[in-house]
Regions:
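Short helix-loop-beta junction
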Residues: 33-41
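Short, glycine/acidic-enriched capping/hinge loops at junctions between secondary-structure elements
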Residues: 27-32, 53
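Ordered, amphipathic secondary-structure segments that act as subunit-interaction surfaces
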Residues: 66-75
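Active-site alpha/beta core segments
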Residues: 12, 16, 23-26
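Divalent-metal-activated hydrolytic enzyme cores
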Residues: 1-13, 37, 46-64, 79-167
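Short glycine-enriched loops at secondary-structure junctions
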Residues: 20-25, 45-48, 74-77
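Divalent metal-coordination and catalytic microenvironments
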Residues: 18, 42, 71, 154, ...
Length: 167
């Protein structure tokens, strides 16, 4: 709306950072009923946290004064499905950048499984949750985020029901 545009023309003041997947079915501004300037959204396949993404999160917290970080994963995630469906670990051949995404998901999931003594089979929902948990952990361990005492929450959006679950 025009009022939101005018209110944000001289700078942004988002109250929250949303780290989510680039899946077109996951639209944080719509899911959380927010407008222009309310959310600082970081999107990539699999809601992974790279150094670049972490820099964006730090920027939002340190320079835009965002008080909340939400890691929002979702069901039917293509990055997770690629990992779960890859029975022969073909991603290890690194044929393309998609394999890099699957490799990162695999590393995250295996790390969480080892820490929690979770069965080794590739369960899709378990892998989705492990992926969300891993991204949350990276953010929580960041010294800038700790220094600002930023609230961090983990959520999973169900593309079948439209419901969001806190993890």
């Amino acid at each position: 709306n025009k009022k939101s545009v005018l209110n944000n023309q001289n700078g942004q003041h988002p109250f929250a950072v949303i780290v989510t997947c680039s899946d077109s079915r996951v639209a944080p501004e719509i899911l959380f009923d927010q407008g222009i300037g309310d959310l600082f959204v970081i999107r990539n396949a699999g809601n992974l946290i790279s150094d670049i993404d972490m820099g964006s999160i730090e920027y939002a917290v340190e320079h835009l004064d965002a008080k909340l970080i939400v890691v929002l994963g979702h069901t039917e995630c293509g990055a997770i499905k690629a990992y779960v469906g890859d029975k022969n670990n073909d991603y290890k051949k690194h044929r393309n950048h998609i394999d890099d995404i699957v490799q990162t998901v695999a590393e995250e999931v295996e790390e969480i499984k080892e820490q929690k003594h979770v069965p080794k089979e590739k369960n899709e929902l378990g892998c989705i949750n492990a992926n969300i948990e891993h991204s949350t952990k990276i953010i929580k361990n960041n010294p800038i985020i700790k220094a600002h005492k930023t609230k961090i929450v983990s959520m999973r959006y169900d593309v079948h029901t439209g419901k969001i679950t806190f993890l």
